[in-house]
């Protein structure tokens, strides 16, 4: 009854298997894709009919990781998977971005893609596997989809591009780039790099696109064997007469409105034109569909902006194609934060802060590929007021998570190593105004805030968003795009980096036919823009401050004998807990004996260091210590010396005469001088008050003659 159809092929160093017809046969299509023991099960369900009045394409992509895939039980209270993690959200976006532009315009039937990770090899990341699975399932489904796409990860090791590097290889790589595209064109790039050149980045994109052709070929072969018939879907016929009537009423007026350079004024005027046009048309014929009229107006609006750009006219806000909007850069804008900056580019503004914490503040991520600790956190917030709207405020949405991750990638390459700067760093970008490329404003603001906080970043970084308008062979690359240019253009191309090279590159291409030459022009134009922004930023702050904020914790590092770690921690953490309370510091101990003491007050840190040195000091036989009586027993007393170490003063060692009752001589908490008589092989300490007293008396005696000699 079950008749699986399987296709195997070699993809770089991995073997990929595509299998369909075995599971989820009630879904529109389902594929199990495996790559060296990492397996992702991808299903697609498409509704045959669109909902009445549906005016957008409702595509949903869900990516979910099951802990059983790694042979683990979830660590949560309920012991089952909950809402998507940040990593799952990012991979869902990674799948969504290259497939969305391949559905035909006018197709508004609901489509859901669900990718479930069911087995994982710690060396093979499931994201590429899931992207291949989504492409295969959509291609098999018969849903109108102009795919398939291929997906590849590209690394750069020893000056060589590496296809789909393993997790271990990625640690050595200067590049982590994911590229997806059809047979003819690149559609999406997502990457982080250690300041590589424009040519190296472009080479990686081209390499990945060439290598992924084997995926596309094998999906096409699988479709020939197991694909469902293509849906008989046709776009709604275009009402040419209505289009012409709307254009006659609105086109010239919209063209004039798009000469208004202020965003709010322009939006207000465009809204008036649209409202008046729709009202006029409905008065002429009340059977017209208002949504349809809105779509026609949007198409005219798009055409107006695009044709002006292609004709070489000034852009919406009056700029030339490669001009950057006016910049305003300020640092130290918030008095009690560790570092802060306000970065404004035209009508886009980001208030960015940097906060320093200890290793205890690092985020522990329990991921499918294994547990890891993140000491650099980047959070991006996009409140509704930034675009003059009202809306829900709460947990971050997919877009905020994606933009935060991109901005983090832009800064990551210049962050100092933990051994040089042992702080956990959190950057938060509050977008206070937005009109295009707020993620790149966040990169610029983060660089400034980190320098203001005294974080020794390797170089300043800046980011820029590029756009593209293309008709036939005629194209124009735009620098520093506005929100409108992003929506109406054919490409969104974000580049972040330093003067030396690129740290992050993200591309989303909405059309086919973007050539290597066009990408080269865009990258070179972006470099010029990046250097211009860095020049303005350097006028505000050109190097990290020499010292961290007075409000930031200072981390002092000392080394102790690893054998003494247990003494500093104490039974059940009792000693270290008491130490932190007593000194008002945060103390962290590593397995190699490295102790990090964090305090905002230098005196508190010195006190903590002194106490740790006391605790870890070797007890010297014959030395006299001042100790405190901690316990009294019939045969003597226990006295704490040298940082919590406890020794026994036998009843015979309390005084130089016979002692009947210990409490006649000693009380709890009493401070007494004690001499160390012996430390046995088990670490037990024998003490004597009697000998300490005898020793201290003769020691003081010779001072009198010395004083006499001095007289």
From Swiss-Prot:
Q: Which residues form a coiled coil?
A: none
List the Pfam families.
KH_1, PNPase, RNase_PH, RNase_PH_C, S1
Q: Does the keyword Oxidoreductase apply?
A: no
Locate the residues binding Mg(2+): 486, 492
- In terms of one coarse class, where is the protein primarily found? cytoplasm
Q: Which InterPro entries match?
A: ExoRNase_PH_dom1, ExoRNase_PH_dom2, ExoRNase_PH_dom2_sf, KH_dom, KH_dom_type_1, KH_dom_type_1_sf, NA-bd_OB-fold, PNPase
Report the PANTHER family cross-referenced here.
POLYRIBONUCLEOTIDE NUCLEOTIDYLTRANSFERASE (PTHR11252), POLYRIBONUCLEOTIDE NUCLEOTIDYLTRANSFERASE 1, MITOCHONDRIAL (PTHR11252:SF0)
Q: What is this protein called?
A: Polyribonucleotide nucleotidyltransferase
